[in-house]
Amino acid sequence: MGASHSTVSDPHRFAVAITGSDDDVRSLQAHPTKSYDYIVVGGGTAGCVLASRLSEDSRVNVLLVEAGYSNHGVTNSIIPLAFPMLMKSKYDWNYETVGMAGINGRTSYWPRGRLLGGTSSINGSMYHRCAPEDFSAWVEEGAKGWEYENMKPYFRKAEGYNPHPDHPNIDPALHGTVGPAKVTHGPIAFLSQPITKDILQSSINVGIRQVHDFNTDVGPTGVGLFARNVFPNGTRVSAATGYLTPSVLARPNLTVAVECMAEKIVLSSDEKVPRAKGLIFSTSRDGQRFYVPASKELILSSGVIGTPQVLMLSGIGPAAELAKHNIPVVRDLPVGEYLQDHFSPGPMLIRAKKGTWDFILRPLGGLLAMVKWFFFGKGPLSSLSVQVACFVRSDDKTFAHPQLPMHDGAKKYQVKDCCSGPTAPDIELFFAPFLAPPLGMKYWPFPGLTSGMLLLKPASYGTVKLASRNAWDYPLIDPNYLSHESDIALSIMGMRLLARIARTKPFADSLDLPEDSDDKTSVFWPTDCNPDTVSDDDLEAWARLHGQSTGHPTSSARMGGSPSTSVVDSKLKVHGVEGLRVCDASCFPTQVSGHPAAVVVAVAERAADLIKGVA
């Protein structure tokens, strides 16, 4: 058991040890313990925002309970480009899905942050509001009040935008300037400038429009450069570093505890409508269990995996699923259903002639990059892994080709339009200026890029189910990749478009590509092949063999108007339960058309106002 660097180290200071039945609410409440108005369960991207905003009111006491570790002193989290070093470390939940037929029975690794700040402490630091139409789609699902015009003030409230001279076409007036989540667009790293400009121009040359700022009312559809969550000193902005600052952590009405695993919400059984009374947690699998009450509300912010797990362990979930584990049903709700993730057919590696960051993977180059970051807060280590991205629609003319139409995939597989609106994208292409080395290799002997595509609006839905009644046992995650034919077609189309951009000048002149390659065993094959002659069947086979998660799951406890198809209402209150809300990516009614971290922050900002009664 530990704590953040300013608060709790002993659970006995804020909770009571359980000696009897945890189902006896009156017995638990009879024990004297510190009282909290609000308990936020989960100190991830949303939880840190909620704890900070709710504790602004000195009249209320707030407890933030995080299952993972403190973020204090985690160097690889502070350095923006060092995030791969956190994958499969103790700061990662290191989830693994079940095997899926769509990817040849393989499982998929799901990284999720296991420290304060959650996945915002281990992700790629891209700042993206996604498409304005995403929020219109939320309203259509019954999430009244969540349209973009209502969300925009909360994006701006969170933003602390810092203009940069490398990006003169960005209008700072469209962004917030004093928010905790510092955002910037620059600088463009000097060594990757030429190849970055080549990618932009080649994307334009195949018909994709240029977008200077992905985060405006116009939306992201087009090619451009990502904004980044990075402080001016070159360090990562996470929900923890942005919202749980030393001054916030010093508030006498805020308690932050880490390494406390939420096991279940205690619900009253003597009222007509069940009410959340408190939280049961433990500090180790076989260790002491503790109880802490909440006088006003509990807010579940345990993430797309943790939130449905805690709900089901508390008796809130599909009745049939709860019955499998002999859990009494408090509310029969579709918890764990409607799970969606951004699927990727796998990395598409490209050999280059020059102009990449591969030098930082070598000992001397890495040392020089570290020195530049440590003393000046500059250089590749202060930058994003992904420099350029294209957001496109599958029905865009870019996909047309006189010799081999991009819609050939739709001849075999019917494409379903899952876009949020007429201008919202359903495919993302990305380019990172270095070659990601395979397992067991430190670096490649030549320069290159790592590229890939994301299926932004999948037609496939998955589930989160319990593995057991023990909160320490990871739940069963099944994103159901490529279970819908449309997802297969879009994956084929996206891979083909990416390969076409790579063979379009001026980008092609920077690359070392063969005329064509039929060596499907090569990790370079998807971009080595000729996009005009490679078959749909071959691209599909590659996607099934190499497909993986991009770490953007949502909607496992989604918001909506009906208890038959959603878990929480438009105020994030769990249907049929008093005093319990959900606030994290699990409450998204539908998947968003981009990187979700900024959306989670904005949702939490609005949720705080809903709880305060001012939204």
UniProtKB/Swiss-Prot annotation:
InterPro entries for this protein: FAD/NAD-bd_sf, GMC_OxRdtase, GMC_OxRdtase_N, GMC_OxRtase_C
Enzyme class, UniProt record, top EC level: oxidoreductase
Expression induction or repression: Induced in strobilurin-producing conditions (on CGC medium after 6 days of growth).
Pathway in which the depicted protein is active: Mycotoxin biosynthesis
Enzyme nomenclature, EC number: 1.1.-.-
Name the UniProt record assigns to this protein: Dehydrogenase str4
Family: Belongs to the GMC oxidoreductase family.
Highest taxon, organism lineage: Eukaryota
UniProt source species: Strobilurus tenacellus
Transmembrane segments annotated in the record for this chain: none
Protein's gene: str4
Complex formation: Homodimer.
Gene Ontology MF, one: oxidoreductase activity, acting on CH-OH group of donors
Cofactor(s) the protein needs: FAD
